[in-house]
Regions:
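C-terminal accessory extensions appended to soluble enzyme cores
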Residues: 78-83, 89-143
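Conserved AdoMet/S-adenosylmethionine-binding subsite of the radical SAM
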Residues: 1-100
Length: 143
């Protein structure tokens, strides 16, 4: 069993992760689990494209690894936002004013995702940022 924690920048969490624990509360929980000897995965997924996303995600990575002992981490996952066309249709009906559901995504095999140029830019940026703290062989991508 691997205990996984999804972590987002504070701005993204405040806007889109209603009723979820704050990002730094998740980091504290991850720390406690690691201190208890449990394998922990940090998930920087789904990455949300927003104003100053580079700054938001860069600060988040620095904040996370100022508190987490990377040598105790099992691994790290990275992935940009993607969603099934059926679920996005439901979300658009339920939350018509949300910027996330109104983005002009590409539909690839029934799943909406950011256009390739945005997606690859975000994911490559995060791999680079996280690899300053974690060996690349412990970083994997969700596709």
């Amino acid at each position: 069993v691997i205990i996984a924690y999804t972590v987002s920048p504070q701005r993204v969490a405040a806007e889109y992760e209603h009723f979820a624990s704050a990002p730094m509360e998740r980091i504290q929980a991850a720390k406690c689990a690691m201190d208890g000897g449990f394998p922990v995965r940090l998930c920087f997924d789904p990455m949300i494209y927003c104003k100053d996303w580079r700054g938001e995600y860069s600060r988040m990575v620095d904040d996370v690894f100022s508190q987490i002992d990377d040598s105790k981490l099992w691994d790290v996952s990275i992935g940009s936002f993607r969603i099934s066309q059926d679920y996005l249709k439901k979300m658009r009906k339920d939350m018509p004013r949300s910027a996330v559901v109104n983005f002009p995504y590409d539909n690839v095999n029934g799943y909406y995702q950011y256009p390739e140029n945005i997606r690859s830019d975000m994911e490559e940026f995060m791999i680079q940022a996280v690899s300053e703290y974690v060996d690349k062989d412990r970083i994997f991508m969700w596709k």
